[in-house]
């Protein structure tokens, strides 16, 4: 999950049925190898450009060959790239990143720090690197002291950030000043921002033996698991979007799986995967939310009733619009469905995946838009043909290298074994590589439904490394060794790792 704002501070450059027990189709051949190699090449291309023009800053500006520091100036792209470099077994890049992480002083930044973004990118990236390099990828780094620094730096970062939870309720401030221990004076915090800390902070406690980090994040989460007042939960498991920092009470009952709400639901089932013993309540709340979503939020465009999207709900009114960010939902249903052995949830997840696939396959670039709608009464005049054909119209045509659609394709491939989903990942990757690639990296697009994507955004988000290229690679990697399979999503309840919302694999507690 990433917050949906597109108030970008960058320059514009230029204008089915599930088959849970199916055999994995054989793509262990030259085609699979060449696809995996192509994704690795894209990763190396983006890394080389970042290293040459932007390192150790946060992100590359891939058109002007400049750099940005939107994530505190600690080298977000490097930390976000670590777990992908590990699963690609690129020892050279892994060592470059480890050497950089050892030098970061997390106590120093002139920026306002986002507790949420810093947790999912930096803390998640380092904890994942530690879990992978202490486990199935231990052979990549012989000097274990370099790996140990990852946990030391994770603890340092947790200690620097934890004052954010020092509020009357324990619901944290998100936008904080780590030098003054101040904050932005916000009265509320968002559902996803509050509810997408618990995996990383619990893992930090489990690895260090210090329970404080888990206690802080789980105290904040407790208000989400037991929402008050009752109007905050219009349907079982589906809850409002904003929480009063002083009281822990919800201030609304607006329900969605869109950005700002999304990864709260994502982490409910993932916490159960992480540790079924401690987090059974999280599972129950996720099941309630999933079942309520099927009953109350499932929506079918009038022009394409075969498609299924999730609507929003607020005070008796439904909103028929969604986002690229929300397209993680199919993968989340698939994960929950396979872990809980619920065929109905798997089938619904596949329906969501199919609909989000349409948002890619029906545009001129083959890439999906930032946001889209399917309200038959609100179709723009110049998009009526698109709506009739595809079942949606574009509300915001930007693409900023988001991963969620490819992410759900990956889950569909892992859960069903059906090769069409693998092919969908490849087709999406080819479209991104064709349309977004620059001489030094990858740029965002202003309009996915315009020739060549319209204009370009001069920014390469760190989640290109962490998510897009990781999911594309894992879908096509040949799992020749049991160790290499360990970090993959598994059918059933045999997962050894669970991905945080930035696609960093975190080792589950009981393995």
UniProtKB/Swiss-Prot annotation:
Name assigned to this protein: Probable mannosyl-oligosaccharide alpha-1,2-mannosidase 1B
One GO biological process term: protein glycosylation
Gene3D superfamilies: 1.50.10.10
Glycosylation site residues: 90, 177, 433
Reaction(s) this enzyme catalyzes, per UniProt: N(4)-(alpha-D-Man-(1->2)-alpha-D-Man-(1->2)-alpha-D-Man-(1->3)-[alpha-D-Man-(1->2)-alpha-D-Man-(1->3)-[alpha-D-Man-(1->2)-alpha-D-Man-(1->6)]-alpha-D-Man-(1->6)]-beta-D-Man-(1->4)-beta-D-GlcNAc-(1->4)-beta-D-GlcNAc)-L-asparaginyl-[protein] (N-glucan mannose isomer 9A1,2,3B1,2,3) + 4 H2O = N(4)-(alpha-D-Man-(1->3)-[alpha-D-Man-(1->3)-[alpha-D-Man-(1->6)]-alpha-D-Man-(1->6)]-beta-D-Man-(1->4)-beta-D-GlcNAc-(1->4)-beta-D-GlcNAc)-L-asparaginyl-[protein] (N-glucan mannose isomer 5A1,2) + 4 beta-D-mannose; N(4)-(alpha-D-Man-(1->2)-alpha-D-Man-(1->2)-alpha-D-Man-(1->3)-[alpha-D-Man-(1->3)-[alpha-D-Man-(1->2)-alpha-D-Man-(1->6)]-alpha-D-Man-(1->6)]-beta-D-Man-(1->4)-beta-D-GlcNAc-(1->4)-beta-D-GlcNAc)-L-asparaginyl-[protein] (N-glucan mannose isomer 8A1,2,3B1,3) + 3 H2O = N(4)-(alpha-D-Man-(1->3)-[alpha-D-Man-(1->3)-[alpha-D-Man-(1->6)]-alpha-D-Man-(1->6)]-beta-D-Man-(1->4)-beta-D-GlcNAc-(1->4)-beta-D-GlcNAc)-L-asparaginyl-[protein] (N-glucan mannose isomer 5A1,2) + 3 beta-D-mannose
Cofactor annotation comment: Ca(2+). Can also use Mg(2+), but with lower efficiency.
Domain of life: Eukaryota
């Amino acid at each position: 999950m990433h917050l949906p704002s597109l108030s970008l501070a960058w320059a514009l450059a230029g204008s089915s049925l599930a088959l849970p027990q199916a055999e994995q189709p054989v793509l262990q051949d030259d085609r699979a190898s060449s696809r995996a190699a192509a994704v690795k090449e894209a990763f190396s291309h983006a890394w080389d450009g970042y290293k040459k023009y932007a390192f150790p800053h946060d992100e590359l500006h891939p058109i002007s060959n400049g750099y940005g520091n939107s994530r505190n100036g600690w080298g977000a792209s490097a930390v976000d790239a670590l777990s992908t470099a590990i699963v690609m077994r690129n020892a050279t890049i892994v060592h470059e990143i480890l050497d950089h992480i050892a030098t970061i002083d997390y106590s120093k930044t002139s920026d306002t720090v986002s507790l949420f973004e810093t947790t999912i990118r930096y803390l998640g990236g380092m904890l994942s690197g530690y879990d992978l390099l202490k486990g199935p990828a231990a052979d990549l780094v012989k000097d274990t002291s370099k790996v140990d620094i990852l946990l030391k730096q994770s603890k340092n970062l947790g200690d620097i950030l934890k004052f954010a939870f020092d509020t009357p309720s324990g619901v944290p401030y998100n936008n904080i000043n780590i030098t003054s221990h101040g904050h932005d004076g916000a009265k509320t915090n968002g559902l996803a921002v509050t509810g997408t800390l618990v995996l990383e902070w619990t893992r930090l406690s489990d690895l260090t033996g210090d329970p404080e980090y888990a206690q802080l994040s789980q105290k904040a989460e407790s208000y989400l698991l037991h929402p008050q007042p009752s109007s905050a939960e219009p349907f079982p498991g589906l809850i409002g979007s904003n929480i009063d920092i002083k009281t822990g009470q919800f201030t609304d009952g607006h329900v969605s799986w869109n950005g700002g709400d999304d990864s709260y639901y994502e982490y409910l089932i993932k916490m159960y995967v992480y540790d079924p013993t401690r987090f059974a309540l999280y599972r129950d709340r996720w099941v309630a939310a999933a079942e309520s979503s099927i009953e109350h939020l499932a929506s079918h465009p009038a022009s394409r009733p075969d498609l299924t999207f999730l609507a929003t709900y607020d005070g008796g009114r439904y909103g028929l619009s969604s986002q690229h960010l929300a397209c993680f939902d199919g993968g989340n249903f698939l994960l929950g469905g396979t872990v809980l052995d619920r065929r109905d949830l798997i089938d619904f997840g596949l329906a969501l995946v199919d609909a989000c696939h349409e948002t890619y396959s029906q545009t001129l670039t083959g890439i999906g838009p930032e946001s889209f709608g399917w309200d038959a009464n609100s179709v723009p005049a110049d998009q009526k043909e698109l709506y009739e054909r595809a079942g949606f119209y574009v509300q915001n045509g930007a693409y900023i290298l988001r991963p969620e659609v490819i992410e759900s394709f990956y889950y569909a491939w892992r859960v069903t074994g059906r090769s069409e989903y693998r092919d969908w990942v490849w087709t999406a990757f080819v479209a991104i590589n064709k349309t977004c690639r620059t001489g030094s990296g990858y740029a965002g697009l202003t309009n996915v439904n315009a020739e060549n994507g319209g204009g370009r955004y001069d920014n390469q988000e760190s989640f290109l490394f962490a998510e897009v290229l990781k999911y594309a690679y894992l879908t096509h990697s040949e799992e020749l060794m049991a160790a290499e399979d360990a970090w993959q999503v598994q059918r059933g309840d045999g997962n050894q790792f669970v991905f945080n919302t930035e696609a960093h694999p975190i080792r589950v507690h009981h393995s």
